[in-house]
């Protein structure tokens, strides 16, 4: 068991070290998200399985608050409305589970973040 735990931490360290190399890309994405929100846009989130839960968490942090008190930010998890999701799947198929919602709710300048 100890060996498995150590291996897990070594793998975790390797992932963290590789993320440092993405700092420029992460900054670019963050700037796009900030620009969207400053222009009264909405950030939409989607994912499946555990990533669906992550999308709901991230949307919640923007609408609620993450650090410090601030105005709520426009953010919607496309994984949160089971009635809409099951209707779309039933009528159109899984292929349109998120795109149909973006067509209904999205506007030019909004951003969709897919998590996997």
Label each region the model flagged:
Residues 1, 22-26, 51:
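Residue-level recognition of alpha-helical structural elements
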Residues 1-21:
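Generic N-terminal amphipathic, Lys/Arg-enriched alpha-helix
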Residues 20-39:
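A short, well-structured juxtamembrane/interface segment
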Residues 35-106:
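Glycine-rich, small/polar surface segments that engage phosphate groups of diverse ligands
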Residues 108-116:
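C-terminal binding/interaction regions
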């Amino acid at each position: 068991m100890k060996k498995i735990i150590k291996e897990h931490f070594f793998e975790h360290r390797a992932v963290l070290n590789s993320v440092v190399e993405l700092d420029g890309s992460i900054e670019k994405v963050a700037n796009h998200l900030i620009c969207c929100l400053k222009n009264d846009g909405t950030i939409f989130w989607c994912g499946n399985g555990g990533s669906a839960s992550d999308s709901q968490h991230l949307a919640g942090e923007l609408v609620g608050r993450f650090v410090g008190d601030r105005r709520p930010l426009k953010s919607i998890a496309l994984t949160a409305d089971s009635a809409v999701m099951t209707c779309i799947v039933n009528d159109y198929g899984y292929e349109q589970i998120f795109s149909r919602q973006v067509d209904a709710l999205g506007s030019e300048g909004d951003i969709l973040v897919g998590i996997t």
